[in-house]
């Protein structure tokens, strides 16, 4: 992430029951970003048994923080599961990708956060750059 007066890294790890890899992914990114010069104040971590409402609330809180920035950088890393709707689509141009949170049926869209919702909730100011790395 380029040097900026305003910078923030968001690390989201969303394992399903019995999975530990997502925690390791988030910890590895946290350690790497600290080693690259970010302070712990520049890092926000959300991980564990997450659900749709918690993730959207987290993103809304971030939005309220960065909405006053005239410029800056936000890095968003997610480690978890993904899906797309409709699940039976045969054309990549007709699908909508999503992140899957919570326990239970991965095919339940009520547990999904669509990427359009992520970007809409963050609603970054025009001169705030977003770097995105989804691992799902």
Predicted regions and their residues:
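Second-shell loop/turn segments in exported
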Residues: 15-20, 44-48, 105
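Hydrophobic/aromatic beta-strand patches that form the interior of the parallel beta-sheet core
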Residues: 8-12, 44, 131-133
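Cofactor-binding loop segments of dinucleotide-utilizing enzymes, especially the Rossmann-like FAD-
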Residues: 12-16, 48, 79, 135
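Short glycine-rich His-centered loop
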Residues: 2-18
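Solvent-exposed, acidic/flexible segments
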Residues: 19-22, 52, 111
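Functional beta-strand-loop-alpha-helix junction segments that form "active/interaction loops"
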Residues: 30-72
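Caspase-like (clan CD) cysteine peptidase catalytic core
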Residues: 6, 56-79, 83-136
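Glycine- and acidic-residue-enriched helix-capping/strand-helix junction motifs
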Residues: 15-31
